[in-house]
């Protein structure tokens, strides 16, 4: 059966040690001009906050929503995504930043079990303003020994585990040399 092509970003599914999956709080600068969607990879920036992470950049973690005071209504607001250019001084991002969290993510091409322990970069920065979900995927064409994420298995999801067809889901962890907490140098 063909896999469902429905990218959803990076979804935390378990912890390598059996521990709890937790989020930590980080700032997003007021008026940051790029939307960040739930399930989208983010990077740490020198100013102490987080921003959207592109292919090849060092990953801090995966965005899990945000909280801010709405600049129009002055009401406290929890949002599944960060609306670009929000002018609030109290924006808090919730980030799954533990490098031992296993995420489920969709391949943009044909991902196979033979690719386990290969590294991949991410692709895409878009998402839905209705659901707040990211549409990031693994860039199947970047399968190498390095990359932002390491595939550790193929998903058990019956709708997206056919490795003979495009868009199979994979289980991934952040690659050691591509995660902020595992670097030996500062940002």
Give the ranges of each region predicted by the language model.
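Surface-exposed, low-hydrophobicity beta-strand/loop segments enriched in small/polar/acidic residues
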Residues: 1-187
């Amino acid at each position: 059966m063909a896999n469902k092509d429905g990218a959803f970003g990076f979804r935390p599914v378990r912890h390598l040690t059996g521990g709890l999956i937790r989020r930590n709080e980080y700032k997003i600068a007021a008026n940051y001009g790029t939307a960040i969607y739930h399930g989208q990879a983010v990077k740490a920036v020198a100013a102490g906050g987080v921003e959207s992470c592109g292919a090849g950049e060092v990953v801090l973690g995966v965005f899990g929503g945000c909280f801010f005071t709405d600049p129009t209504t002055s009401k406290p607001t929890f949002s599944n995504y960060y609306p670009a250019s929000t002018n609030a001084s109290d924006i808090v991002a919730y980030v799954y930043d533990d490098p031992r969290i296993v995420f489920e993510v969709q391949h943009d091409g044909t991902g196979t079990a033979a690719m386990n322990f290969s590294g991949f970069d991410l692709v895409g920065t878009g998402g839905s303003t209705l659901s707040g979900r990211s549409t990031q995927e693994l860039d199947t064409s970047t399968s190498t020994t390095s990359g932002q994420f390491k595939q550790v298995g193929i998903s058990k999801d019956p709708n997206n585990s056919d490795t003979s067809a495009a868009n199979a889901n994979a289980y991934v962890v952040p690659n050691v040399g591509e995660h902020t907490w595992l670097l030996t140098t500062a940002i």
